């Protein structure tokens, strides 16, 4: 199926429209690439543990499993690790259908959730899942130098934390800048509101501390692409937080950070068009 995207439904904040033309070309190329790989075969693998079997936490052993969607008969393919949303309190691993049938692998991890764990356990689990992918994807035919990371909502927050605070992936022997690109969709850039909830702080009171992506802004050695829903339909200040992060990162000397505001889509609805754009970016 060919994706038809009307330019008026996508707002991209850039300093020139050359990049918007690139976006439209990427979507057109995606239509072609989907046709080329439509006949490829894929296999789905379920509930692979990405932590040690002798981990002392029974809940971690229970929760820290991932599913994989892998091209068969291909070598050197790209892989995206995709983190589900759910406010760090709910949700489950999902092999997003919008990312499928494009010649890439999808790794979809679960991670521990509040209230059975607390910050920073969520982010440490996310880092462990990405590190497992980097270290093991070659066993399935993938290229470990072509690993991407993305996620929606809480998954977007985790994506941002892994991109900006290098210590999480470093704990597992992976350089955050070795990831090819990060694609957070509607992620909070202040400290996540569930982490505020742990501390009995109001949902509406923004906190920027070491658990805020903003607080960890740095000069990046890889790509970061931001996606949000329509500023009038998104969760409170979600678009504005991401726009501010873009400004902070560029102020630190990063090459322009793209941000896509997807007009007409609310917080839940934005994940589908964002995933299609991500797939287009990965396969261009």
Over which residues does each language-model region extend?
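Short amphipathic alpha-helix adjacent to the substrate-entry channel of hydrolases
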Residues: 92-109
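Active-site-adjacent alpha-helix of alpha/beta-hydrolase-fold enzymes
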Residues: 100, 199-209, 228-258
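Short beta-strand element of the alpha/beta-hydrolase
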Residues: 76-85
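Primarily recognizes the serine-hydrolase "nucleophile elbow" in alpha/beta-hydrolase
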Residues: 134-197
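Alpha/beta-hydrolase active-site loop
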Residues: 117-138
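Mobile cap/lid helix-loop segments that gate and shape the active-site cleft of serine hydrolases
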Residues: 184-216
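C-terminal catalytic histidine-bearing segment of alpha/beta-hydrolase fold enzymes
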Residues: 227, 243, 250-284
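N-terminal cap/lid segment of alpha/beta-hydrolase-fold proteins
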Residues: 39-74
